[in-house]
Amino acid sequence: MPSFDIVSEVDEVELRNAVENSRRELSGRFDFRGKDASIDYKDHVVTLTAEDDFQCKQLVDILRTQLSKRNVEPSTMDVDEKSVHSGKTFSLKVRFKQGIETDIAKKIVKMVKDSKIKVQSQIQGDTVRVTGKARDDLQAVMALVRQADLGQPFQFNNFRD
């Protein structure tokens, strides 16, 4: 029986490249000359540090642009609401969504069942496995999940015939 997995993951290498490109752009930007600003990456968390709250927002925009250029979906970013003020610097933490949370996975399963496509879907940890008799049904589910707006991008892997 054909099957595939629906996952949501960020490519670690592309994320690191986007952070490095953001650092390069930061060093060349005129509005950040002579300012204490940095972009640090560690364990799927990017820390943006600047002298002003407005500059932190600019750093988020720089990072978002570089992620787009590296084909990493910016909707995977989870930016803190308020920047943390310590001493003379402000810092923002940007986390990246890895895996599908259970409530979003339940929405996917419900959406697939409501579509009346003849497939079975089941939640397996942070992935959703979809199994069906016909490959066309699986491709219809892929199209359905792609057009749904659930707040994060999805990839389809482990396609088996």
UniProtKB/Swiss-Prot annotation:
Nucleotide-binding found in the keyword field: yes
Keywords assigned: Nucleotide-binding
A Gene Ontology molecular function term of the record: nucleotide binding
Signal peptide span: none
GO cellular component: a single term: cytosol
SUPFAM superfamilies reported in the protein's UniProt record: YajQ-like
A Pfam family reported for this protein in Swiss-Prot or TrEMBL: DUF520
Entry keyword RNA-binding: no
Family the UniProt entry places it in: Belongs to the YajQ family.
PANTHER family: UPF0234 PROTEIN YAJQ (PTHR30476:SF0)
Name of this protein: Nucleotide-binding protein SO_3815
Taxonomic source organism: Shewanella oneidensis (strain ATCC 700550 / JCM 31522 / CIP 106686 / LMG 19005 / NCIMB 14063 / MR-1)
